């Protein structure tokens, strides 16, 4: 992926650069990238059975941008002056209305994939959309930030990120594990030569580029890096985990694994073997900027905003499936089942409400920009790791063995020796045909019971941070803004209205005339 083929650097000058179509996106992946799977290098991720339908699910999202009915929802005018259009979340938000527009666009795109692509192309707009207003944060690399803001917005490049170090020697600082963590090994006129590894490079096999930063404290300059790297960069390698998409194709059909077979964001180990990062792709090369990235770049509030809207869509989908499921099993009228379905809807409503609150109670930021409300975002980040596992548990409780009282394969339905028995003994309640019951319950099993489903629970539990950090960082955020003082002051106000001698408020009547014990 050579970004220069997509862009015109002149700000405010009309050009022909537009967001990719689905076909253009797929073609952009045919660039010779080094992706390894099952002991072999993948020639073309768009045709390999481990990645091809997941790539086509993303292509479907790009095609949606070009549908006339999406104008004003998924497609709005750019702010670069090129005369093009873009997804609203790739632009600087300057009002609550802008954030609502961004939220609605995130939702519209996620409805194309039923909420199952956590790292969709607009996920990294959480970062890219900050660069226009916050370019000064990157100091000497300010112009790089502005250029990437323009490029990413006009072409809507698909970036992922990898900011976590491999879980090796976690008791040591990153800059004491030079054989593992990403660092500069050489400076050249052309750029920085970088080696090391990053995880978890979710979906990176089918992205145009990756964004690399760091989470945690750094002390040595050579580790203080923030940069982007095209996926076809020489020396950049991806070692992919097993493919749920390919496993689904081998073991079943889309009828058997309707989610695994098309929405698998393959996670990978990303290795840099003396990769050249051109200076124009560098955002920071110092520890102060790298250490301040999470709290000062604007990314934190926005990635939580994207995640909350996405999860709300996912829960819409899951709630609909579960309600249909209990109808098919005949338990929809049971009081206990109704209670638990109500709880799923409570979780669904909470995340929709948090996405509303994040958008409609924005915080002023830099250069006239606004950010989604941080406190509501932090609440989402805590409760996503509680709510999603709970929803999964409810599904297992209310549907029970129905999730596995299923025949093995779609081909069973074509076997005349089997079909009459399946139709009789595997049918649903209320006149639901066996094949329709099995179709729905296999969908739910893929959501919660397969390896794909297990990976999604792990993702929702952890992608926003570990279970301790997401909670204590909420406290730290309150302390940083003085909101903790306001809350303690509220408690102190109550305590100031009385003392050991009685009421201190003049409007309240003392009780000396009623006391049994008198001093």
UniProtKB/Swiss-Prot annotation:
Cofactor: FAD
Oxidoreductase keyword on record: yes
Primary enzyme class: oxidoreductase
GO biological process, any: 4-nitrophenol catabolic process
Chemical reaction(s) catalysed: 4-nitrophenol + NADH + O2 + H(+) = 4-nitrocatechol + NAD(+) + H2O
Activity regulation summary: Partially inhibited by concentrations of FAD above 10 uM and completely inhibited by concentrations above 50 uM.
Keywords, sorted A to Z: FAD, Flavoprotein, NAD, Oxidoreductase
GO molecular function terms listed in the Swiss-Prot or TrEMBL record: 4-nitrophenol 2-monooxygenase activity; oxidoreductase activity, acting on the CH-CH group of donors
Domain of life per record: Bacteria
Keyword set includes NAD: yes
EC number: 1.14.13.29
Pfam families attached to this UniProt entry: HpaB, HpaB_N
InterPro entries cross-referenced by the UniProt entry: Acyl-CoA_Oxase/DH_mid-dom_sf, AcylCo_DH-like_C, AcylCoA_DH/oxidase_NM_dom_sf, HpaB/PvcC, HpaB/PvcC/4-BUDH, HpaB/PvcC/4-BUDH_C, HpaB/PvcC/4-BUDH_N
pH dependence: Optimum pH is 8.
Family annotation (PANTHER family): 4-HYDROXYPHENYLACETATE 3-MONOOXYGENASE-RELATED
Function noted in UniProt: Utilizes the flavins supplied by NphA2 to catalyze the degradation of 4-nitrophenol (4-NP) via 4-nitrocatechol (4-NC) which is used as the sole carbon, nitrogen, and energy source. Can also degrade phenol and 4-chlorophenol as rapidly as 4-NP.
Family of the protein in this entry: Belongs to the FADH(2)-utilizing monooxygenase family.
Subunit structure: Homotetramer. 4-nitrophenol 2-monooxygenase complex consists of an oxygenase component NphA1 and a flavin reductase component NphA2.
Entry protein name: 4-nitrophenol 2-monooxygenase, oxygenase component
Provenance organism: Rhodococcus sp
Name of the gene: nphA1
